[in-house]
From Swiss-Prot:
GO terms for biological process: nucleotide metabolic process. The active site is at D69 (proton acceptor). Keywords: Cytoplasm, Hydrolase, Nucleotide metabolism. The record marks R11, T70, Q157 as: Important for substrate specificity. It comes from Idiomarina loihiensis (strain ATCC BAA-735 / DSM 15497 / L2-TR). This is dTTP/UTP pyrophosphatase. CDD domains: Maf (cd00555). One of its GO terms (cellular component) is cytoplasm. Nucleoside triphosphate pyrophosphatase that hydrolyzes dTTP and UTP. May have a dual role in cell division arrest and in preventing the incorporation of modified nucleotides into cellular nucleic acids. GO terms for molecular function: dTTP diphosphatase activity; UTP diphosphatase activity. Belongs to the Maf family. YhdE subfamily. Signal peptide: none annotated.
Length: 198
């Protein structure tokens, strides 16, 4: 059965190649709008499931689709991608010297050509401790251009990694796709013969 990754993220694509399974990528079209009473875990899980389902529904033949989403939570507040330098600087000051949570959900859905017939989802929470940052470090990081498309304005796998003192949990989940959990979900479908292992 064909395997698809519902993502436009080059980071997720690179991570999925580490599992040594053939797959194709398609960009999902999902409105990322958090409900008024939706907590962070429910929100990121819903987005992962919607990404997988929207790509699955375009397919004419049976397939498995992986969807994933990541967000950053600090003291109950979801930190989005920076809208401006001021927004970025504010978030970096919040995270400076503090521990925040990175929530990543991965969902695998099975599509039979007409409807979703099975779905398995995992939510991974990782604690990330930041070093204390100076304004000069914050400004220099913004100038690299890296923060612009990142949740909370940093990427652990890039320049932003030098601010991370410690993590407790999954490094790969912080990057965008928890490899262990993704592998386990795919194995669940393999047990029923639903994954093409060419």
């Amino acid at each position: 059965m064909r395997l698809l990754l519902a993502s436009s993220s080059p980071r997720r694509r690179e991570l999925l190649t580490l599992l040594h399974r053939p797959f194709d990528c398609e960009v999902p079209e999902v409105e990322e709008l958090r409900g008024a009473n939706e907590n962070a875990g429910d929100y990121v899980t819903r987005l992962a499931e919607e990404k997988a389902q929207t790509v699955a529904q375009r397919q004419q033949t049976p397939c498995l689709v992986i969807g994933s989403d990541t967000l950053i939570s600090f003291k109950g507040q979801v930190l989005e991608k920076p809208e401006s330098y001021e927004h970025f600087s504010q978030m970096m000051k919040q995270l400076s010297g503090q521990t925040h949570q990175v929530l990543t959900s991965v969902s695998v859905c099975q599509w039979n050509g007409h409807k979703v017939v099975a779905r398995e989802t995992a939510l991974v929470t990782t604690q990330v401790e930041f070093a204390a940052l100076s304004q000069g470090e914050i400004d220099a990081y913004w100038a690299t251009g890296e923060p612009h498309d990142k949740a909370a304005g940093y990427g652990i796998q890039g320049y932003g990694g030098k601010f991370v003192k410690r993590i407790e949990g999954s490094y790969f989940a912080v990057v965008g796709l928890p490899l262990y959990e993704t592998e386990q979900l795919l194995r669940m479908f393999e047990m029923t013969g639903e994954v093409d292992e060419r």
